[in-house]
Amino acid sequence: MNYLLPLFSVLLGYGIALFLKPKSKTKLKLLLAFSGSFLLSLTVMHLLPEVYESHNTNIGLFIMAGILFQIILEFFSKGAEHGHVHGHETMSHIPWLLFVSLCIHAFLEGFPVSHHHNLALGIAIHHLPIAIILTMFFINAQLDKKAIFFFMITFAVMTPLGTILSDYLPILNNYYNEITAVVIGILFHISSTIIFES
């Protein structure tokens, strides 16, 4: 049931932005900063010690690969993973590069959740302000409401999908430490960026 927290979090953020239309950017930034700090503490206190217990000498390389991978994803998403969206132009269609990079990011975040149920809460707290900010951005860009719903529901499903795949594909368990190290790199980059930008 914990793996559904990120899904409900995105849907809650979508609903808040759609119906309540929050105006205070300061409160959103504070929520974003809290989510980044919470994610960083979960990563350092839970994920990092576990991957280093495996005594795999290449774990650091996988963490660096995760950081590099996130930098590449941000090139396409323009930093939307950490609430960084710009622009007031009108959109007639879904920004596909943003969509694909956010879905890959959310999907990979789901892998360690099956072994660390408290990480689901951290990801949910991280996804809530992102969902609010993205939905408000799309509404302001006058993107079609069906397209916004499709974008947000797909984004919401990605993290639980990553968790389910890691549970039901035993071959992935052979590479659990390596995959988790890549996710640690991704989470390090995102949480530190959120903290420094807030």
Can you describe what each PLM-predicted range is?
Residues 1-198:
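Intrinsically disordered, metal-sensing/regulatory segments
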